[in-house]
Amino acid sequence: MDGDNQSENSQFLLLGISESPEQQRILFWMFLSMYLVTVLGNVLIILAISSDSHLHTPMYFFLANLSFTDLFFVTNTIPKMLVNFQSQNKAISYAGCLTQLYFLVSLVTLDNLILAVMAYDRYVATCCPLHYVTAMSPGLCVLLLSLCWGLSVLYGLLLTFLLTRVTFCGPREIHYLFCDMYILLWLACSNTHIIHTALIATGCFIFLTPLGFMTTSYVRIVRTILQMPSASKKYKTFSTCASHLGVVSLFYGTLAMVYLQPLHTYSMKDSVATVMYAVLTPMMNPFIYRLRNKDMHGAPGRVLWRPFQRPK
C-alpha cells in the first residue's frame, strides 16, 4: 500500500486490551472514573495556583503547566477509549491516528521537559537561595516554558512525519488502547529499521538528557541538604523536593516499563504498563503534590468549597 495515498484513506481498528463485552464494561467504568478523578485533580491544581497569590512562584507556575499537560494528555487518549468500549465500531481513521500520536508524543515530551525545568528550579532554590529571585525571574520562567513547548511540538512533528513514510498492509488491528508509535511500527510491512533507529536516537536525546540533568541536580540538592545544620530545615527542604522526585520516579518508571524493550519483543497486551503510563501517572501527580507539599495541602480544597462559602 502506498504510504502517501492509500494510507490516508485507510482505517485502523482500536481493539483495546480486551474483546470480552463483560470486561469492556468493567474497563469503561474504571477508565471513566480514573479520567474524572484526573480531570478534577488537575483542574483543582490549576485553579488553586492561579487564584492564590501565595502560590504565584516559579515552582507552582511550572506545576500548573504540568497539570495542564496531564489534563490534555488524558483527554487526547481516554475519551476515544471510552467510545470504543461502548461501541461496535472501533475504527479510527489514518489521519485521526496520526493526530492522536502527534499529541501523545508532544505531551509526553512536554511533561519530560517541564519536570527537568522544575528540577532546575528546586536546584536554584536549595543550592543558591540568595540568587533565587534573580535566577528564576518571570521572564526566564516564560522563556524556559516556551522552549519546552517549542521542542515538544517539533519532536511530535518529527516522529509523526517519519510515520507517514511507513507503509501498512494486511490487518490493521491495534490491540492497544491508543495509537502508539511502537504499535504502528509493529504493524508496518515496509522496512522500519531506519525509522526505528531514528526513534531510539532522538528518544535517548530528548528523554535521557533531561533525566541526566535531573539526576545531577538532585545529587547536588541532596549534598546541600546534608550540609544543613538544622534538622528541621533539612526536613522542610527535602519535603519540598520530595513531591517532584516522586512524580519524576513515577513518570520515568512507567515510561521505561512500556518503551525499554526491543521492537520485536514489544507486547501489545502489556495492559498493566499501558494503564500506568496513560492514566495512572497523570491521575497520581496532583495527589503526590498535595500529600508531599505543605503549601498545596489545603489549596485545592479551598477552591472546591469556595462557591459554597457565604460572603462575609
Curated annotation (Swiss-Prot):
It is found in: Cell membrane. GO terms for biological process: G protein-coupled receptor signaling pathway; sensory perception of smell; signal transduction. The chain crosses the membrane at residues 26-49, 58-79, 101-120, 141-158, 197-220, 238-260, 272-291. Keywords: Cell membrane, Disulfide bond, G-protein coupled receptor, Glycoprotein, Membrane, Olfaction, Receptor, Sensory transduction, Transducer, Transmembrane, Transmembrane helix. GO terms for cellular component: plasma membrane. It is a multi-pass membrane protein. The keyword Membrane applies. Disulfide bonds join 97-189. Residues 1-25, 80-100, 159-196, 261-271 are extracellular. The keyword Chloroplast does not apply. GO terms for molecular function: G protein-coupled receptor activity; olfactory receptor activity. Residues 50-57, 121-140, 221-237, 292-312 are cytoplasmic. Glycans are attached at residue 5. InterPro entries: GPCR_Rhodpsn, GPCR_Rhodpsn_7TM, Olfact_rcpt. It comes from the Eukaryota. Gene3D superfamilies: Rhodopsin 7-helix transmembrane proteins. Odorant receptor. Belongs to the G-protein coupled receptor 1 family. This is Olfactory receptor 1D5. It comes from Homo sapiens.
